[in-house]
From Swiss-Prot:
Name under which the protein is recorded: Thyroid hormone receptor alpha
An example Gene Ontology biological process: negative regulation of transcription by RNA polymerase II
The keyword Transcription regulation is assigned to this record: yes
Gene Ontology MF annotations: nuclear receptor activity; RNA polymerase II cis-regulatory region sequence-specific DNA binding; thyroid hormone binding; zinc ion binding
Binding, 3,3',5-triiodo-L-thyronine: 228, 277
Domain NR LBD: 163-407
Keyword Thylakoid found: no
Cysteines joined through disulfide linkages: none
Chain spans, region Disordered: 1-32
Record remark on domains: Composed of three domains: a modulating N-terminal domain, a DNA-binding domain and a C-terminal ligand-binding domain.
Superkingdom of the source species: Eukaryota
Originating organism: Ovis aries (Sheep)
Length: 410
């Protein structure tokens, strides 16, 4: 025998369980919509504890289609409207069924009428096209908020103090006064002839070969390039205050790293060349066959990646200062003093990057990774130098070149 659902009590107010504002909308406590965790999942914080669905009395999960309802009634109402099912609903008991969490699935018509009676809004149910548009709008708003948050975080990041600005200006001027050709390097560079560096003749133990003509061309510019690195360091007060022994160790350790950085920031994607010492534009194979071997690839790749950073003179100068003041060089006496100097440059560097407000996400940590790349280039060159010294005629090496790169750690 079929069980007959209970009848609705006449005169009952289906909105008694909800609190409404004058405009008919459900009030949200404190206007908050954050989530809180319960044993049954996530529920909005504006719900009272154990608040019931206004349709069936089950535990409510949120504010759906203008009413506080459970997930079941929300889904039932949405499907009914989206698929236009309500004209097909019927009731065996004159539309007088009581709807609760036990009987709600027994009569679709009475359940739908209860949804309408408590105030669920049909016009808030979106069809597929509107739902896609809404989802797109939500994503756009989310992206907009993300960008606004990024801008706010950039604005809140500390910028250089007056003392740091002094440090920054000194480093910048030291770089500019020792950086050959300055900003005019493109107009003044000369391309190494294509026939130089294309016919390696001296074999190296690592399998590479060296073109002695190209090597000879590079040695002509290496001495002034080294001298400019030394001059840069001496213009930094923190460096000049160190003992001569520490100055020599730091210079020998960072010289190739700084020269590589100065070449890398003068990478030209149009000609795919690096400009050495501000005057000689060379191709990858020429630099490789001229003695640098695989080190050439590393410097070219660094140049390509740095081109996206759009570094200015100050950032290059501070990067050089950080490389110079490295405490892990063997034999240093004033390690603590050098470490404090590097920390001062790093902090000023970070604050200056904040001041510049680059558009690249995570610009600062990405830039610091280039320090690691340059340290690797320096280590690879030290190993390469040992092979070159054995295989190439000693008279081809300038005295300053030998003085700086001999006895380096590999």
């Amino acid at each position: 025998m079929e069980q007959k659902p209970s009848k609705v009590e006449c005169g009952s107010d289906p909105e008694e369980s909800s609190t409404r504002s004058p405009d008919g909308k459900r009030k949200r406590k404190n206007g908050q919509c954050s989530l809180k965790t319960s044993m049954s999942g996530y529920i909005p914080s504006y719900l009272d504890k154990d608040e019931q669905c206004v349709v069936c009395g089950d535990k409510a999960t949120g504010y759906h289609y203008r009413c506080i309802t459970c997930e079941g009634c929300k889904g039932f109402f949405r499907r009914t409207i989206q698929k236009n099912l309500h004209p097909t609903y019927s009731c065996k008991y004159d539309s007088c069924c009581v709807i609760d969490k036990i009987t709600r699935n027994q009569c679709q018509l009475c359940r739908f009428k209860k949804c309408i009676a408590v105030g669920m809004a049909m016009d808030l149910v979106l069809d597929d096209s509107k739902r896609v548009a809404k989802r797109k709008l939500i994503e756009q708003n989310r992206e907009r908020r993300r960008k606004e948050e990024m801008i706010r975080s950039l604005q809140q990041r500390p910028e250089p103090t007056p003392e740091e600005w002094d440090l920054i200006h000194v480093a910048t001027e030291a770089h500019r006064s020792t950086n050959a050709q300055g900003s005019h390097w493109k107009q003044r560079r000369k391309f190494l002839p294509d026939d130089i560096g294309q016919s390696p003749i001296v074999s190296m133990p690592d399998g590479d070969k060296v073109d002695l003509e190209a090597f000879s061309e590079f040695t002509k510019i290496i001495t002034p390039a080294i001298t400019r690195v030394v001059d840069f360091a001496k213009k930094l007060p923190m460096f000049s205050e160190l003992p001569c022994e520490d100055q020599i160790i730091l210079l020998k350790g960072c010289c190739m790293e700084i020269m590589s950085l100065r070449a890398a920031v003068r990478y030209d994607p149009e000609s795919d060349t690096l400009t050495l010492s501000g005057e000689m534009a060379v191709k990858r194979e020429q630099l490789k066959n001229g003695g640098l071997g695989v080190v050439s690839d590393a410097i070219f790749e660094l140049g390509k990646s740095l081109s996206a950073f759009n570094l200015d003179d100050t950032e290059v100068a501070l990067l050089q200062a950080v490389l110079l003041m490295s405490t892990d060089r063997s034999g240093l006496l004033c390690v603590d003093k050098i470490e404090k100097s590097q920390e001062a440059y790093l902090l000023a560097f970070e604050h200056y990057v904040n001041h510049r407000k680059h558009n690249i996400p995570h610009f600062w940590p990405k830039l610091l990774m280039k320090v690691t790349d340059l340290r690797m280039i320096g280590a690879c060159h030290a190993s390469r130098f040992l092979h070159m010294k054995v295989e190439c005629p000693t008279e081809l090496f300038p005295p300053l070149f030998l003085e700086v790169f001999e006895d380096q750690e590999v």
